[in-house]
Amino acid sequence: PSYAKSAKTLPLSKETVDGSPATGSSLAVANSKGYSIDQRYSPAGTIITEIKTGQILWDENSTVEWTPASMSKLMTIALTYDAIKEGKLSINTVVPVKERHARVSANSNLSNNKMQVGASYTVGELMELIAVPSSAAATYMLMDLLAPDIDTFVTMMNNKAKELGMVNTKYVNPIGVLNVLLGQDGPSGDPYADNYTSARDYACLCTYLVTNYPDLLNHTINANLVSKPGTIYEERFEGHNYSLPGEKYAFPGADGIKTGSARKGYNYSLTAKQGNTRMIEIVLGVSVWGDSSAESMRHLIGNSILEDAFAKYEYRKVLSAGKYSVKGKIIEVKEDFYDCVPKDYKPKFICDFKNKKLKLNISNRQYLNGFAEPSASFELIKTVA
């Protein structure tokens, strides 16, 4: 009887609410907000996910194969953070510039900073050079810390992609260009091969990075960079992620991650946090290389769909730990239950006594690889007569 008195009634529902991701045209969403963006800027693929659950909130051709371009360099950053976690190096490890790095930095086919033999950079400084000017030479300097040669490193990249469930991704080099453009510093194999991926796969990678290595945000939050200030190696760079703080299309709560542009168009990845809710956004394939307006258009489009996602969804507690009365039984939920839900949603639950699990009455939700629908475990305390 005392259990029954202290237990709250758990709101149940046999009917489910549709939780399918929003779909459609991101360009149309942007234009519905008052922009007049030409059809040629329609992205090849976009996705928005909530980071804690991996739930897909917006999906526009998210599995279409596309080149990540310079966003390829995020995988080098991921492997570097893995090595830091394993104790092989630290964010403050000093890396000297070698002749090869200076040669790569002089390759006019690549985004770069000027690397000079005699200079040295910490791992953290190299990450910032990758994040803002998208330095190929900085990428090579990190690669050379982690692998004996580029072919071995590319294998490491692909193994990590497989581990993260990036099923539509293949890397052929760490830079994100045709192999032939890397000259003598390129890998073996097809000289005209390029990396390919999908928006969904890059959401997996960005989710992994931001979740496991939030220090990354310290290196990607700034759109602009002064490298080696006050030294003979000082360089100043203006970045291209216009959704970051202080930029012309700054998005509320944005604090990383990276852009990438290639012959097939303009891409970017972004993470933003509002309240307790953090989202990941990937935009791939806006217009084509050389279209000077495309860098702006990708952010107007991306910001528009991200604004809608934050307006609709939040990550919040949907059930407190405690005792509940369910169908003549008393159950105890040991931990608070959190989920990503529409802001106007009033939680109702489906109770699985066989597996001792509670989940929300929301159907058709989709998740990134490696994630599953959230649930809460419970113990059966008593059957009330």
Model-derived features with residue positions:
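Domain-terminus/edge residues, biased toward the C-terminal soluble/receptor-binding domains
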Residues: 190-385
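Active-site-adjacent loops and short helices of periplasmic peptidoglycan-processing enzymes
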Residues: 3-200, 210
